[in-house]
C-alpha cells in the first residue's frame, strides 16, 4: 500500500505543476522502404530523422527504434506499417522539403524528427496538407500551441521536462544526503536549448532548489572547440554543471573537463548527449557519473523488457534509451490508431490518434493519451546515471532500478 501511495503522490505533484503551464520486415541499408509487419494492409509512414549533419549520431540511434518495432507490433496484433525513411540532414529547410516529398510519394502519416526546429517545420507541412504527424522527440512548447488538428506529440514540452527534472533532482539529493549550492548553466543555442533556458527562468523558482545559477553560458551545438566555455564555467567555482546539450558537444565538453582538470560535484543534464550509446562507448570510464533528468522509460514495465530484448538482439551492446523508446512509441501510436480507424483517410487517422488510450507502453507514466492540443501531458520524466557503460534509473522511486552514486568521481582518479 505504501508504494502505491507514494506513486500516486508523485503523479499528483507533477500534474498539479503542469496544470499551471499552459521486423518481420527486412531492412536494406540503402532501401527507402521497409515493412513493419503486423496484419492487414500496410499504412505508409514517413519517418524523418537527422541521419547526417551534426545530429547524425542521434538520428541513426532513433532509427533503431524503427528497426526493432516489427516483432512487438506483430505480437500486439497491430496492422503493418510501410516505413518510408527520409534524412533531414540536421537542417530545418531540408526537413520541410523531405516532408513535402514524402507526402507527395504517398505517405499517409508522418513521424519524427528529434529536433524541435525540424519538427516545427514538418508540423507546418503536415497541417497544411492535412496529414497526421506524430512527433517522436521535440520539446519546444509552441509546436502544440498553434491550434493544429493533425499534429500530436508523445514527448514532454520543455516546462514538463524541467518540472520533472527538479522533482527528481530533489529526490536524488535527498537519497545522496548532499546537494550543490551553486551551478553553471550551459546550453546549446538552438530552438530546444533556447526554450529550455526560458523554461528554467519560469520553472526553477517554483521548486525552491538548493542551488542557485551563478552563470549562464550558451554555445553553438555544432562547435568543434568548447575550451573557452569550460574555462569560463570552471572560473566560477560552481559546485555543479547544469546542462542542456546534444551528443557531439557532450563528448567535447567531457574531454575539455578532463583536459582542464575540473571535476564538478555533479553534471546534471536535462537533455540528450550524456546518456547516448556513442557517448558511453567513446569515453569509456570517463563517461561514468553524469545524471540525466530526461524523458525516459520505466524498466519495470513489460513492454520495456520486450523492447530491451529486441534491441539486444538487433544491436548487441547498445543500451535502450530515449531515442529508441519514443521513436518506437510513435510507431505504436500510429499502428494502434490505424487499427482503430480501419482506414487510411487522414481525418479518420487523426481522430483515431487524438483518442489514443494506450496503457501498456514503455515510457514512464500512466500511458499515452493526448489532450485537446495534441500533447501527451501525462508523460513523466526520470533520472538516469551512467555506471560502467550501463544506464541505471535512479528516480522516481516508482520506476527506479538503482540508487545514485554521489559525488562525481574525479576524472584523474579513474583507471
Task: Annotate each PLM feature.
Residues 25-27:
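Hydrophobic core
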Residues 2-5, 12-20, 29-415:
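Extracytosolic ligand-binding ectodomains
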